[in-house]
A protein has these predicted regions:
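Ankyrin-repeat-protein effector appendages
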Residues: 20-62, 218-219, 223-245
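Ankyrin-repeat boundary/"N-cap" motif
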Residues: 57-68, 91-100, 126-135, 161-172, ...
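Ankyrin repeat domain, specifically the short helix-to-loop turn at the C-terminus of the second helix
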Residues: 79-88, 114-122, 149-159, 186-194, ...
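Alpha-helical segment of the N-proximal tetratricopeptide repeat
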Residues: 64-80
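Classical Sec-dependent N-terminal signal peptides that target proteins to the secretory pathway
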Residues: 1-21
């Protein structure tokens, strides 16, 4: 083991030691996380949403302990901290300024989401990663039940196919498709999501330039996502067919 890997291992062990064992099925250094290790890896990793990886090192900043409790899924600790005056709308300054609800929605911790909402957490919480409400945080995540719950609360204020909110014209189904969120894409389609919209940005330097849900699935080699979208009428606007090439 080289020095870098040794240091990382020590950090992970230290991180895991900060909380109670919540999930004994995880590798030892991740047993303090409620989420399954495999689910966390699927959610965010070096290749997918690397700026939202939350399980490799402790939180930093003024509210670090609060965000560690949220990320670990330690609901009892979250309740205690709120009872002792913790600001529920505090921002995770060591990351992208997410709120607790933003993190919980992304992680897909349904119990945590329910509790934070019951305590009045703001559904319009933003973060610096181009998130403008908690529904988008949930769509970036991978728990369709959380998406459904938040959508039910925000339905009258959110247009599934609105291309005016994101500066590049991305829609929720594009975001979910690009991150291989199969169940969420199915739900969005059931709610009327247009599978053939294309981003509106004219800035060719942007990653999102000239993309649709299917072109994202093609670019990221997401075969199951491609099949799902095509079954629901998607055409690759770049090829004029259902083909990626």
């Amino acid at each position: 083991m080289n020095i870098k890997m040794f240091v990382i291992s020590l950090l992970l062990v230290s991180f895991g030691a900060q909380a109670l064992i919540i999930n004994e099925n995880n590798p030892p250094e991740y047993q303090s996380f409620k989420s399954n290790y495999s689910d966390m890896i699927e959610l965010a990793n070096k290749s997918r949403l690397p700026h939202r990886v939350f399980y490799t090192s402790p939180s930093t900043g003024r509210n670090a302990l609060w965000f560690d409790a949220v990320k670990h899924g330690d609901l009892n600790e979250v309740k205690k901290m709120l009872a002792n005056g913790q600001d529920i709308e505090a921002k995770d300054t060591g990351s992208l300024d997410q709120t607790a609800l933003g993190w919980a929605a992304f992680i897909g911790d349904e119990e945590m989401v329910d509790y934070l909402i019951s305590q009045g957490a703001n559904l319009w919480a933003t973060d610096k990663g181009d998130v403008y409400n908690v529904f988008k945080s949930a769509v970036l995540g991978n728990n369709v039940n959380v998406v459904k719950k938040i959508h039910a609360l925000m339905r009258s204020d959110i247009e599934i196919n609105n291309q005016r909110v994101e500066s590049d014209g991305e829609t929720f189904i594009m975001i979910a498709a690009s991150n291989n969120r199969i169940d969420i894409v199915k739900y969005l389609i059931s709610q009327g999501a247009d599978v053939n919209l294309v981003t509106t940005t004219q800035d060719t330097s942007l990653f999102s330039y000239n993309h649709s849900a299917l072109s994202y699935a093609c670019q990221n080699n997401l075969k199951d996502m491609q099949r799902l979208l095509i079954r629901n009428g998607a055409i690759n606007h770049r090829t004029g067919t259902t083909s990626c090439h």
